[in-house]
Structure formats: C-alpha cells, structure tokens
C-alpha cells in the first residue's frame, strides 16, 4: 500500500500542523482510511484536517494525539484555530490530479448549476454543511474508476 506523504517544498502555505501530522502518519505507516476509522471521520475529512482545511474538534485532537503519539498540547496549539481554507492551492492548480478536479468544475460547473437549479430552485449547495467521499469501482473489463461523491445542504 502506498501512503500519502507531504513534500513541504511543494506546499509552502500549509499550517505547521500539516508537517506535524504527516510526519507522524509516515512514522506510523498509517493510511487516511486507518486514521479516519480511529477518529470517527471519513477519510477525505481526515485528510482535510492534515492539510489545514478543516477544523479539528477537541475529540479529534485527543484521538489523533493517542493514535499518532503527538502531545495533545502541541495538537491543541496547532489545530484549535480556525482553518484558513483555500490558500494551500495555487490557481489554476499545477498538480495534475487537482487540476483535473478544477477542470471538471470549469467544464461542468454551469451544467451542474442548471440541473441543481431545476431540481432545487434558486440557491447554492453548502460547502459547510457538506460531506464528500471517494470510492473505487472496477468495471467488468478490470478498469478502475474513481467515484467522488459531493453532498451539500441546499
């Protein structure tokens, strides 16, 4: 199994907590799925904590401290503030996978908007009252497909 790691030189705008968490994750050889199971979040929400894009609860801090052997005081200091969302990614993104997600919104954004407006009326989908997940599907020919679900309150 390959594990996501952090190359801080490619992410100069991440908070200090990112380096702390990724170093412990690598040392323990844990996947985001394993960490998510321990803290009771899904794996994308857990990864968002590591990148400083989500707010950690006191329970998250306690459970991460236990699992990763990081002082709760260090995690409290690094994770208890409000996230500075969105500053970690340059626009347009240069990383190919992140660029493809950006490209999906460029190509399908207005189509999503039109269909959502027809189904729900005027409004927006929340990114606060929101959840997302990633699943892997394999078709009959053995091809792997990524399935990304976005669920936001209207």
From Swiss-Prot:
Domain of life, source organism: Eukaryota
Lineage of producing organism: Eukaryota, Fungi, Dikarya, Ascomycota, Pezizomycotina
InterPro entries assigned: Cro/C1-type_HTH, Cyanase, Cyanate_lyase_C, Cyanate_lyase_C_sf, Lambda_DNA-bd_dom_sf
Organism: Aspergillus fumigatus (strain ATCC MYA-4609 / CBS 101355 / FGSC A1100 / Af293) (Neosartorya fumigata)
Gene Ontology terms, MF aspect: cyanate hydratase activity; DNA binding
Catalytic reactions of this protein: cyanate + hydrogencarbonate + 3 H(+) = NH4(+) + 2 CO2
UniProt record similarity statement: Belongs to the cyanase family.
Protein known as: Cyanate hydratase
Extent of the signal sequence: none
């Amino acid at each position: 199994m390959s594990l996501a790691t952090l190359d801080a030189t490619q992410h100069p705008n991440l908070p200090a907590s990112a380096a702390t968490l990724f170093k412990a994750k690598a040392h323990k050889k844990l996947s985001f799925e394993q960490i998510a199971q321990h803290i009771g979040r899904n794996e994308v929400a857990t990864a968002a904590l590591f990148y400083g894009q989500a707010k950690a609860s006191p329970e998250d801090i306690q459970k991460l401290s236990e699992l990763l052997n990081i002082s709760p005081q260090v995690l409290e200091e690094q994770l208890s503030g409000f996230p500075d969302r969105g500053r970690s990614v340059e626009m347009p993104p240069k990383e190919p996978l992140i660029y493809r997600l950006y490209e999906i919104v460029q190509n399908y954004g207005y189509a999503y908007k039109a269909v959502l407006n027809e189904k729900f009326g005027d409004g927006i989908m929340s990114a606060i009252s929101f959840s997302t997940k990633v699943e892997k599907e394999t078709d009959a020919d053995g091809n792997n497909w990524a399935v990304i679900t976005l669920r936001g309150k209207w």
